[in-house]
Amino acid sequence: MAHPLTRRKFNALTVALSSVWLASSLGLVVTANVAQAQAPKGPEFKLIKPDQTPDVEKGKIEVIEFFWFGCPHCNGLEPSVREWKKKLAPDVVFKRVHVPFREEKHQQLFYTLESMGKVEDMVDKVFYAMHVEHNPLDNNKKMVEWATKQGLDAKLFEQTLESFGVKTKMKKASNLAAAHQVDGVPALTVNGKFYTAPSMAGSNGHALRLVDQFVEQERKAKK
């Protein structure tokens, strides 16, 4: 089974980010317990200690995906996340947090797109550029050229890229990742309490099923 990307492992990545996440060989079987509200006991997840306070309205449940654009595992998870999001209940707030591992320019790109209100429209296109077209998007010139090809206002994009607001978002994201004890990506957290990842759960699908289970547990705890 592929292992999560860590700071130490990032240096081993090549510029052509074309790795493919190997299918899990653990032979994990999803049982009816996954649908129950009681959290499982085992290495498929860990508890975040101390708990982190969710940044959502009262009564809402926060789910965070910690990721990096350059990560092939995150690219592999994206289609599953896209389908999973379509079924989210109104009380679940899904957030993406881009970690600062290895390439801060990618974090800067994400928060520039977010500040422009374009992140959901562009996430798939960024992954495609990096992992299919092998465009590293690792400096301002490449990012501005890419943004222009996507129909974004080049001047506004460049101004936003170097804005104080984006730098503030980057710092907040980095602090959030540290507080949630993120040491590899992709990683998924629920309400600042539960932490799982495809590498821990055995597959993308099982990781998301665990997230659903933790969401249900938090929902019942609020009643």
Feature annotation, model-predicted:
Residues A2-E103, E216-K223:
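Extracytoplasmic thiol/disulfide redox context detector
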Residues L5, K9, K149-K223:
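C-terminal cap of thioredoxin/glutaredoxin-like
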Residues Q38-I48, N135, N140-K141, L210:
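Periplasmic c-type cytochrome electron-transfer domains
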Residues F67-G70, V81, K85-L88, L113-G117, ...:
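Sec/Tat-exported extracytoplasmic proteins
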Residues G70-H73, P100-E104, Y128-E133, S163-V166, ...:
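Solvent-exposed loop/turn segments at secondary-structure junctions
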Residues E78-K85, H106-F110, V123, N140, ...:
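Extracytoplasmic/secreted envelope proteins and their assembly/folding machinery
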Residues K87-M116, E120-A147:
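Structural microenvironment flanking redox-active thiols in thiol-disulfide oxidoreductases
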